[in-house]
C-alpha cells in the first residue's frame, strides 16, 4: 500500500473545555497513544444542547485549548463547532469531518462514560455509528448503568479490544483511563474563590486565565 493510500486514524474529543484541564489532556493523550492515532482533535463546543451555557466566551475557550496542545504532536484543535450559529450536534460534526476523509479512513468519537450513557437523548444518536467508531473512557469509579437502548447496541456492536476495531466506523469499545479527580467545575470554583489551580491546568492555560482575568467572582 502506498503512502497516499494509507488509512488515517482520526479521533475527536468534544467538550466545553471551560476551562481545558489535565483530565481532558491526559485522556486525549492516552487514547491517541493506545490507538496509534494520526491525530486526536479537541473540539470545543459552542452551545452544547445537553450542557449548561459555558461561563466564558468561545474565543477564550478556543484559545486555552490551543495553548494546551502546543508542542504535543498527536493533539490538535478543531474549531468547526464554534463557527456554527446554532447548537452543536455531534452528528453534524461527524458528517462534516467524514466528508473530508477518505472512505476507508477510521474516525473515532471519544466519550466519557456519563456522556455515553446519555446518548439516547442526543439528536439522531442512532446514526452516529454510520460515521465513526465510539471509544468510551471508563473509570474504575463509574457507577452509572447504561439504559436498555445502549445495552442492545453494545450487544450488537461491542469490540472487546479497542485496537482491533476495523473498518471506517460501526463499533464500540472501552478504554480504561488514568483516574484524575479534577473537573472544570472544581477549577472554576477555586478560581472564583481566589485559590490557585496550578498543576490542575497546563501552565500556558493558567497564564491565559490570569492574563484575561477569567472565572473571577463578580465584585
From Swiss-Prot:
Its EC number is 2.7.7.18. It holds the Pfam family CTP_transf_like. It catalyses: nicotinate beta-D-ribonucleotide + ATP + H(+) = deamido-NAD(+) + diphosphate. Signal peptide: none annotated. SUPFAM superfamilies: Nucleotidylyl transferase. InterPro entries: Cyt_trans-like, NadD/NMNAT, Rossmann-like_a/b/a_fold. GO terms for molecular function: ATP binding; nicotinate-nucleotide adenylyltransferase activity. Belongs to the NadD family. Catalyzes the reversible adenylation of nicotinate mononucleotide (NaMN) to nicotinic acid adenine dinucleotide (NaAD). NCBIfam families: cyt_tran_rel (TIGR00125), nicotinate (nicotinamide) nucleotide adenylyltransferase (TIGR00482), PRK00071.1-1 (NF000839), PRK00071.1-3 (NF000840). This is Probable nicotinate-nucleotide adenylyltransferase. It comes from Pseudomonas putida (strain GB-1). The gene is nadD.
Amino acid at each position: 500500500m502506498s503512502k497516499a493510500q494509507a488509512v488515517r486514524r482520526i479521533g475527536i474529543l468534544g467538550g466545553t473545555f471551560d476551562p481545558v484541564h489535565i483530565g481532558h489532556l491526559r485522556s486525549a493523550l492516552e487514547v491517541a497513544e493506545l490507538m496509534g492515532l494520526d491525530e486526536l482533535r479537541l473540539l470545543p463546543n459552542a452551545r452544547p444542547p445537553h450542557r449548561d451555557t459555558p461561563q466564558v466566551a468561545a474565543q477564550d475557550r478556543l484559545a486555552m485549548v490551543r495553548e494546551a496542545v502546543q508542542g504535543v504532536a498527536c493533539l490538535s484543535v478543531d474549531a468547526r463547532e464554534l463557527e456554527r450559529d446554532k447548537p452543536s450536534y455531534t452528528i453534524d460534526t461527524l458528517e462534516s469531518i467524514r466528508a473530508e476523509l477518505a472512505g476507508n479512513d477510521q474516525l473515532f468519537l471519544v466519550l466519557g462514560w456519563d456522556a455515553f450513557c446519555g446518548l439516547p437523548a442526543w439528536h439522531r444518536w442512532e446514526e452516529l455509528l454510520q460515521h465513526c467508531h465510539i471509544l468510551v473512557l471508563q473509570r474504575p469509579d463509574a457507577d452509572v448503568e447504561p439504559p436498555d437502548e445502549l445495552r442492545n447496541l453494545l450487544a450488537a456492536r461491542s469490540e472487546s479490544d479497542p485496537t482491533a476495531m476495523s473498518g471506517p466506523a460501526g463499533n464500540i469499545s472501552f478504554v480504561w483511563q488514568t483516574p484524575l479527580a479534577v473537573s472544570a467545575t472544581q477549577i472554576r470554583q477555586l478560581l472564583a474563590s481566589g485559590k490557585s489551580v496550578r498543576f490542575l491546568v497546563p501552565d500556558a492555560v493558567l497564564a491565559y486565565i490570569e492574563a484575561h482575568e477569567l472565572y473571577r467572582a463578580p465584585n
